[in-house]
């Protein structure tokens, strides 16, 4: 709502109600998250739109993020790089399941509130206009659901709750692979030094949403972190 009336790539940003006054022949749901796509479809249908919908997220054949993770996992195994795997921002566990399958012999530490975004992480998002995130977004998950998605659930260690509080007790861990998909600035900024300082030589951090227009905080946190340590992110 805060972006209505503004422009993106020269195109006006309209409310769903106003956009339908233009009688579109087709509506494109320009999100990759299936839950958000379903919410958008439901909203459009409730407003009376009965035309065709194009969902690019459902058409993805090649997932560059998953392919990159598998390539890194293969290198970690081939080079016998020591350490655990971890993910911050698990949601329903789809990517965690891929990590679990690619590194089947490693403990996999999973950090998530499992209750969606927390209000305490949203002040900076609003003040800097980093996202339109709301408390409770991505709450449609549970630890049980994630565990059922994992091919090797016996290797999973769950850390439910607010990050970085949930990192307490993990200070002695060392990591070979870490996925950071927290979306927001505050948890991403908190996670980067904690995992970087515990990354084994040859290990990898994979950061999601670095160039996202929806969640700008992850990229901002990464740029600030790299600048402070003279690190080149690739």
Which residues does each predicted region cover?
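Glycine-rich, N-terminal phosphate-binding loop of Rossmann-like dinucleotide-binding domains
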Residues: 31-32, 182
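A solvent-exposed beta-alpha-beta segment
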Residues: 1-31
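Low-complexity, intrinsically disordered regions enriched in charged/polar residues
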Residues: 34, 63-66
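Internal alpha/beta domain cores that form substrate/cofactor-binding pockets in large enzymes
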Residues: 12, 16-22, 35-57
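S-adenosylmethionine/decaboxylated-SAM
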Residues: 52-63, 70-74, 78-234
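Short, charged/polar "capping" segments at the starts of alpha-helices
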Residues: 2-8, 34-40, 119
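Short, conserved catalytic or adaptor-binding loops enriched in Gly and charged residues
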Residues: 6, 45-46, 147-152
């Amino acid at each position: 709502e805060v972006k209505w009336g503004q422009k993106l790539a020269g195109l006006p940003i309209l409310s769903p109600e106003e956009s339908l006054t233009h009688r579109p022949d087709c509506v494109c749901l320009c999100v990759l998250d299936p839950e958000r796509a379903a919410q958008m479809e439901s909203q459009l249908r409730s407003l009376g739109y009965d035309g065709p919908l194009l969902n690019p997220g459902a058409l993805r054949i090649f997932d560059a993020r998953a392919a990159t993770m598998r390539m890194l996992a293969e290198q970690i195994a081939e080079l016998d790089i020591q350490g655990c795997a971890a993910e911050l921002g698990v949601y329903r566990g789809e990517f965690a399941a891929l990590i679990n399958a690619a590194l089947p012999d490693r403990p996999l530490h999973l950090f998530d509130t499992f209750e969606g975004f927390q209000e305490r992480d949203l002040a900076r998002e609003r003040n800097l206009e980093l996202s339109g995130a709301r408390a409770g977004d991505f709450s449609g998950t549970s630890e049980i659901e994630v565990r059922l998605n994992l091919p090797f659930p016996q290797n999973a260690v769950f850390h439910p709750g607010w990050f970085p509080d949930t990192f307490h007790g993990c200070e002695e861990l060392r990591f070979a692979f870490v996925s950071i998909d927290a979306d927001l600035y505050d948890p991403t900024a908190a996670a980067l030094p904690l995992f970087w300082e515990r990354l084994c030589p040859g290990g990898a951090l994979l950061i999601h949403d670095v160039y996202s227009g929806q969640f700008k905080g992850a990229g901002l946190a990464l740029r600030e972190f790299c600048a402070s340590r003279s690190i080149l992110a690739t």
